[in-house]
């Protein structure tokens, strides 16, 4: 027996047979051992062959085990396992059969044929199941066709379409493919190309997520329903699984052999099979090593002659990177562009998929949720494409609601925690014997009984609601199953059964679902539901917030009031700049009300004024208000961009330069936090060419970084600060604010009236007109007066108070001390910054010495007052 002439699977079967005989201590390796090994092979051809004949491989396997158990065992040092003469004859016969069939190698089917032709118990067992040489040969012809065994792994080329492809038409017939809404133009174009005589190979090109694969699935559904031209009726649409083709191809040439078998099978179908190759670019280079042919080169001849009809799908970037470089491959495919559907089309697609997702998750999805998913994803998720991102939103929102239904309700959880707390207290009181404890125990037991009763009622209500939701889900699943059956009966022409379902069972089930839904809504109005089963607009907004960090949750009445009072919130930290605060507040309100231009940033402002008047503080306060986090402020010091080449630090270095993969400081910050406040400090210090990148940001709300990615700035607030015109502002008459405790000036000096024009004139000398023209507002920050400094003193001292509270020390500052600090910290030129230094020097330094000396400890209340010409500290006694 020359095992070199055996295939890999046949050699494995012989080795497994020997191992089995040795393990069972059998003296000889016989046909039973070999047949057992052949049936045990996972990816072998024998089990499918026996099934094709009509016998049961499992039954044969069990019978063989019984036979092997009855065989005598040989033990002892002299025991050896030999090959039985009958098995040697069977192997020799298998070799003769291989030569007779002009096969180069002995395969597993030759061994089975040889065993069936022997005069042994194994052959008789096979014959009893109808497995004879004739039935084996007939079944083998169906599986193998006219192929010869020319390699040591022929099994990989048998039934290759079933192994390496998914039958989309079968899936469509079984309604296992989601419905495809719209895309009629693209499907018609694909059918048009497929109907050509040569080069009948369309390739779908589009951005990821626009629905390229869905178009092919739509074509499969049309083929099944017969809504296609005559040339495509009855065709099979198979999706090639390139991963399965490559997997397990250990030796050189195995991959090419498998792919060749697929191509030949498609060619032999005489146009009956259309091959769909998803991610077409993966063919280029697949299987190639050391200059050997790759998959795309194997496909080219068949594609050019029109013998292989295929549909490709790939993204624009991959098509340009891989397919366009291979001109010979590119010309064999006809391009079909798939554009992103509009918002209206996406809403229609979601409405078509709505029922599928409702059945899967067991919840109801409101129409407003579908509209919100489309509109909000289009507005806020800019790095992905419709309809994919909208479908994902609905799917995750429904999944989140399903988890809430299956988890214990919050109200019930709170009652459980309260009961646990009361039980702990009760256990503690039982140890006490004083009258007060006994009285408290009586009250506690009554309270505990009330909570236990409430918990029992809530648990019953929860189980009832869960039961109703589960019942509704079962009804919907049954309804979907009946609809699939009705479609299949209609397609097969069994109109009686189709009519029975359409006019009998389906309407009856729809009525049950309607009554159950009405009952749920009625009960929710009366007793207040513990569980929600409807996905609404608010759920979609929460998922958007989780994905992007953008607070787009629906504005409640309290939140609306919060934005109406925005000025007063900002003025608590930004003093004396009423006009600037009002303008920025109006911009935020316009955005929240949905009135702002969605193609531009939320607001872009140039703040000019002297140092220390609140320009940077306004940006910090705004970030804190919008996100409850000052870290949402991205601050870029423009004095670092005084050279022309420094622009690459903002948007990232171009290809070929050091740092290309790192990205830009500005673009990366916005990509990670798309909803943020951008502060460009001291803009006049940057190089003039740096401002060119602002033109695109301010006008279109977008910027392309060094790697070609488009970064969205539409959800940012851009604040630029500058000290231009500071000398004019300082020389103007003391400005006054419109706060309640400060009088409104009746007249303005000539300098104050001409100040805005002077500032604008100076800005035109520093910045180009196209830059200034794109800014929403130029905010002139006025210099701070003594009264303003007095108000800022309160704000700064409050920060000191909060810092001391962490050490459990209270601080009270008298008015005289505040007035002293305000006077020491007032500087007409430097704004509020000297005040901070004065508080550090006069108050914090002295206070630190007192605390470290041990004079004041935790729990103390320190009073700060004036003693002669300096601050003094005393401890307040209760």
Swiss-Prot record:
<dbReference type="GO" id="GO:0016887">
    <property type="term" value="F:ATP hydrolysis activity"/>
</dbReference>
<dbReference type="InterPro" id="IPR028299">
    <property type="entry name" value="ClpA/B_CS2"/>
</dbReference>
<dbReference type="InterPro" id="IPR017730">
    <property type="entry name" value="Chaperonin_ClpB"/>
</dbReference>
<feature type="region of interest" description="C-terminal">
    <location>
        <begin position="784"/>
        <end position="878"/>
    </location>
</feature>
<dbReference type="InterPro" id="IPR036628">
    <property type="entry name" value="Clp_N_dom_sf"/>
</dbReference>
<keyword id="KW-0677">Repeat</keyword>
<comment type="function">
    <text>Part of a stress-induced multi-chaperone system, it is involved in the recovery of the cell from heat-induced damage, in cooperation with DnaK, DnaJ and GrpE. Acts before DnaK, in the processing of protein aggregates. Protein binding stimulates the ATPase activity; ATP hydrolysis unfolds the denatured protein aggregates, which probably helps expose new hydrophobic binding sites on the surface of ClpB-bound aggregates, contributing to the solubilization and refolding of denatured protein aggregates by DnaK.</text>
</comment>
<feature type="coiled-coil region">
    <location>
        <begin position="391"/>
        <end position="525"/>
    </location>
</feature>
<feature type="binding site">
    <location>
        <begin position="609"/>
        <end position="616"/>
    </location>
    <ligand>
        <name>ATP 2</name>
    </ligand>
</feature>
<feature type="region of interest" description="NBD1">
    <location>
        <begin position="159"/>
        <end position="340"/>
    </location>
</feature>
<dbReference type="InterPro" id="IPR003959">
    <property type="entry name" value="ATPase_AAA_core"/>
</dbReference>
<dbReference type="InterPro" id="IPR003593">
    <property type="entry name" value="AAA+_ATPase"/>
</dbReference>
<keyword id="KW-0175">Coiled coil</keyword>
<keyword id="KW-0547">Nucleotide-binding</keyword>
<dbReference type="GO" id="GO:0005737">
    <property type="term" value="C:cytoplasm"/>
</dbReference>
<comment type="subunit">
    <text>Homohexamer. The oligomerization is ATP-dependent.</text>
</comment>
<dbReference type="GO" id="GO:0005524">
    <property type="term" value="F:ATP binding"/>
</dbReference>
<feature type="region of interest" description="Repeat 2">
    <location>
        <begin position="83"/>
        <end position="146"/>
    </location>
</feature>
<feature type="region of interest" description="Linker">
    <location>
        <begin position="341"/>
        <end position="549"/>
    </location>
</feature>
<dbReference type="InterPro" id="IPR027417">
    <property type="entry name" value="P-loop_NTPase"/>
</dbReference>
<dbReference type="InterPro" id="IPR019489">
    <property type="entry name" value="Clp_ATPase_C"/>
</dbReference>
<dbReference type="InterPro" id="IPR018368">
    <property type="entry name" value="ClpA/B_CS1"/>
</dbReference>
<keyword id="KW-0067">ATP-binding</keyword>
<dbReference type="Pfam" id="PF10431">
    <property type="entry name" value="ClpB_D2-small"/>
</dbReference>
<dbReference type="Pfam" id="PF02861">
    <property type="entry name" value="Clp_N"/>
</dbReference>
<dbReference type="InterPro" id="IPR050130">
    <property type="entry name" value="ClpA_ClpB"/>
</dbReference>
<feature type="region of interest" description="Repeat 1">
    <location>
        <begin position="6"/>
        <end position="71"/>
    </location>
</feature>
<comment type="similarity">
    <text>Belongs to the ClpA/ClpB family.</text>
</comment>
<dbReference type="InterPro" id="IPR041546">
    <property type="entry name" value="ClpA/ClpB_AAA_lid"/>
</dbReference>
<keyword id="KW-0143">Chaperone</keyword>
<feature type="region of interest" description="NBD2">
    <location>
        <begin position="559"/>
        <end position="783"/>
    </location>
</feature>
<dbReference type="Pfam" id="PF17871">
    <property type="entry name" value="AAA_lid_9"/>
</dbReference>
<keyword id="KW-0963">Cytoplasm</keyword>
<dbReference type="InterPro" id="IPR001270">
    <property type="entry name" value="ClpA/B"/>
</dbReference>
<keyword id="KW-0346">Stress response</keyword>
<feature type="domain" description="Clp R">
    <location>
        <begin position="3"/>
        <end position="146"/>
    </location>
</feature>
<protein>
    <recommendedName>
        <fullName>Chaperone protein ClpB</fullName>
    </recommendedName>
</protein>
<dbReference type="InterPro" id="IPR004176">
    <property type="entry name" value="Clp_R_dom"/>
</dbReference>
<dbReference type="GO" id="GO:0034605">
    <property type="term" value="P:cellular response to heat"/>
</dbReference>
<dbReference type="Pfam" id="PF07724">
    <property type="entry name" value="AAA_2"/>
</dbReference>
<dbReference type="GO" id="GO:0042026">
    <property type="term" value="P:protein refolding"/>
</dbReference>
<feature type="binding site">
    <location>
        <begin position="206"/>
        <end position="213"/>
    </location>
    <ligand>
        <name>ATP 1</name>
    </ligand>
</feature>
């Amino acid at each position: 027996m020359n095992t070199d002439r055996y295939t890999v699977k046949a050699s494995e079967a012989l080795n497994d047979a020997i191992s089995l005989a040795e393990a069972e201590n059998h003296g000889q390796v016989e046909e039973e051992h070999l047949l057992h090994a052949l049936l045990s092979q996972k990816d072998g051809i024998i089990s499918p062959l026996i099934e094709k004949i009509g016998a049961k491989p499992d039954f044969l396997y069990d019978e063989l085990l019984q036979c092997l158990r009855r065989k005598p065992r040989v033990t002892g040092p002299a025991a050896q396992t030999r090959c039985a003469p009958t098995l040697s004859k069977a192997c020799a016969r298998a070799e003769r059969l291989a030569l007779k069939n002009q096969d180069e190698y002995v395969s597993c089917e030759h061994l089975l044929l040889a065993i069936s032709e022997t005069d042994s118990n194994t052959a008789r067992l096979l014959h009893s199941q109808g497995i004879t040489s004739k039935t084996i040969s007939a079944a083998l012809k169906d599986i193998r066709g006219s192929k010869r065994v020319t390699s040591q792994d022929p099994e990989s080329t048998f039934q290759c379409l079933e192994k390496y492809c998914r039958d989309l038409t079968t899936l469509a017939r079984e309604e296992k493919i989601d419905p495809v809404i719209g895309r009629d133009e693209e499907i018609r174009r694909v059918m048009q190309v497929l109907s050509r005589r040569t080069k009948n190979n369309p390739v779908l090109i589009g951005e990821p997520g626009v629905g390229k694969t869905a178009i092919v699935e739509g074509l499969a559904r049309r083929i099944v329903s017969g809504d296609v031209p005559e040339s495509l009726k009855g065709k099979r649409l198979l999706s090639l699984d390139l991963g399965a083709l490559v997997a397990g191809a250990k030796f050189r040439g195995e991959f090419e052999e498998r792919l060749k078998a697929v191509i030949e099978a498609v060619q032999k179908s005489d146009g009956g099979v259309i091959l769909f190759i998803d991610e077409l670019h993966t063919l280029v280079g697949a299987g190639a090593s050391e200059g050997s042919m790759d998959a795309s080169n194997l496909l080219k001849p068949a594609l050019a002659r029109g013998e292989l009809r295929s549909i490709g799908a790939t993204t624009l970037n991959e098509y340009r990177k891989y397919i366009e470089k291979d001109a010979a491959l590119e010309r064999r495919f006809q391009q079909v562009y798939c554009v992103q559907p509009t918002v209206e089309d996406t809403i229609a697609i979601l409405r078509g998929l709505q029922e599928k997702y409702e059945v899967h998750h067991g919840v109801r999805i409101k129409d407003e949720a579908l509209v919100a998913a489309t509109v909000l994803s289009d507005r806020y998720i800019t790095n992905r494409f419709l309809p994919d991102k909208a479908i994902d939103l609905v799917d995750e929102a429904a999944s989140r609601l399903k988890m809430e239904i299956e988890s214990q309700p919050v109200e019930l959880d709170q009652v459980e925690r309260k009961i646990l707390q009361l039980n702990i207290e009760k256990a503690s009181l039982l140890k006490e014997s004083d009258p007060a404890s006994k009285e408290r125990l009586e009250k506690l037991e009554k309270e505990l009984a009330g909570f236990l009763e409430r918990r029992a009622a809530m648990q019953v209500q929860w189980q009832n609601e869960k039961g109703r939701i589960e019942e509704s889900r079962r009804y919907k699943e049954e309804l979907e199953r009946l609809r699939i059956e009705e479609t299949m009966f209609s397609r097969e022409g069994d109109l009686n059964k189709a009519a029975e379902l359409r006019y009998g069972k389906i309407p009856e089930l729809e009525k049950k679902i309607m009554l159950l839904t009405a009952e749920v809504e009625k009960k929710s109005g009366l007793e207040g539901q513990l569980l929600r089963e409807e996905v609404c607009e608010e759920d979609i907004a929460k998922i958007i917030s989780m994905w992007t960090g953008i607070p787009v949750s629906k504005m409640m009445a309290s939140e609306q009031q919060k934005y109406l009072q925005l000025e007063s919130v900002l003025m608590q930290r930004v003093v004396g700049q009423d006009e600037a605060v009002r303008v920025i507040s109006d911009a935020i309100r316009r955005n929240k009300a949905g009135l702002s231009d969605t193609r531009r940033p939320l607001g872009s402002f140039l703040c000019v004024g002297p140092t220390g008047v609140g320009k940077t503080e306004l940006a910090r306060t705004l970030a804190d208000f919008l996100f409850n986090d000052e870290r949402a402020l991205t601050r870029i010091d423009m004095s670092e961009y005084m050279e022309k080449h420094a622009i690459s630090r903002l948007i990232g270095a171009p290809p070929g330069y050091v740092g290309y993969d790192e990205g830009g400081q500005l673009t990366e910050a916005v990509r990670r936090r798309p909803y943020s406040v951008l502060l460009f400090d001291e803009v006049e210090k940057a190089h003039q060419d740096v401002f060119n990148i602002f033109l695109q940001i301010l006008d279109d709300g977008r910027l392309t970084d060094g790697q070609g990615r488009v970064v969205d700035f539409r959800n940012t607030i851009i604040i630029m600060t500058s000290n231009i015109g500071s000398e004019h502002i300082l020389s103007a008459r003391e400005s006054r604010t419109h706060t309640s405790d400060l009088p409104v000036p009746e007249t303005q000096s000539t300098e104050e009236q001409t100040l805005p024009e002077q500032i604008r004139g100076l800005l035109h000398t520093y910045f180009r007109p196209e830059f200034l023209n794109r800014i929403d507002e130029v905010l002139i920050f006025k210099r701070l007066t003594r009264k303003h400094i007095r108000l800022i003193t309160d704000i700064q001292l409050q920060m000191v108070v909060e810092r001391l509270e962490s050490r459990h020390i209270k601080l009270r500052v008298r008015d005289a001390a505040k007035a002293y600090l305000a006077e020491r910290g007032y500087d007409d030129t430097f704004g509020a910054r000297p005040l901070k230094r004065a508080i550090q020097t006069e108050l914090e330094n002295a206070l630190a010495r007192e605390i470290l000396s041990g004079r004041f400890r935790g729990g103390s209340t320190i009073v700060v007052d004036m003693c002669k010409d300096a601050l003094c500290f005393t401890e307040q006694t209760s």
